[in-house]
Amino acid sequence: EVNYSFNDNLNLAVRYSVDYYQDNRLDYRPPGSASEGNNGQYIEDRYSNKLSQLNMFLTGGLDINSNIGLNYTLGYQQFESDYRRLSAFEAVFTNPDQEFLNPGNAASQNSLPSGFRELRRQNGVYGVLNFDIGENLLVELTGRGETFSTMPNAGIIFYPSASIGYKLTDLINLDALTFLKVRASYGEVGVAPPAYI
């Protein structure tokens, strides 16, 4: 993460992260074993997944006039997921010796190699505007536009939201009441489809 302040009212933050894992699995059943693979069975799976994410956003604030203040956030987000799987299944070994414990030790009709890859990318820009009006009224407006690699012809998908809140504590003068606020919100959200449906 890198942070930079242009001045007291404008700041930039950049965050980048990568998460990677690999999972290798091997299942071997020698010929003559007490299982369904009694003529020998070899199963190997190799899984890997890399998740990377970039976030950049500007935050700031200003006073529009003596009664209205504004705080804002403008940002960009990029997400990528790269999932891979390689698999091999073999049965009825050609050579039962364990020295030949690898793919290629079975006739083609008893060998089933397979591979799969899913690559997904997502890009989005967003903005949040928070208005403080007077001492009791708060208005928040947000918007987010996204593109998805799983929807290449959809263009930019936009999600708006808005909320308004009012502090009633000053209007209701009760010693037993320390804080009372009402809030109403509206928002739209969406989820991208999987890569293959």
Predicted regions and their residues:
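Surface-exposed extracellular loop regions of Gram-negative outer-membrane beta-barrel proteins
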Residues: 1-63, 120-151, 155-170, 180-197
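Surface-exposed loop/turn segments flanking beta-strands in extracellular/periplasmic regions
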Residues: 26-42, 84-113, 197
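Short, glycine-/polar-rich solvent-exposed loops and beta-turns at beta-strand/coil boundaries
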Residues: 156, 175-178
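Feature marks short, surface-exposed loop/turn motifs that line or immediately flank catalytic pockets
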Residues: 20-22, 80-82, 147, 190-192
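Membrane-proximal, glycine/serine-rich, low-complexity loop/turn segments characteristic
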Residues: 1-3, 7, 67-71, 192-197
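Outer-membrane beta-barrel channel domains
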Residues: 61-75
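Transmembrane beta-strands of outer-membrane beta-barrel proteins
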Residues: 12-14, 70-74, 139-141, 160, ...
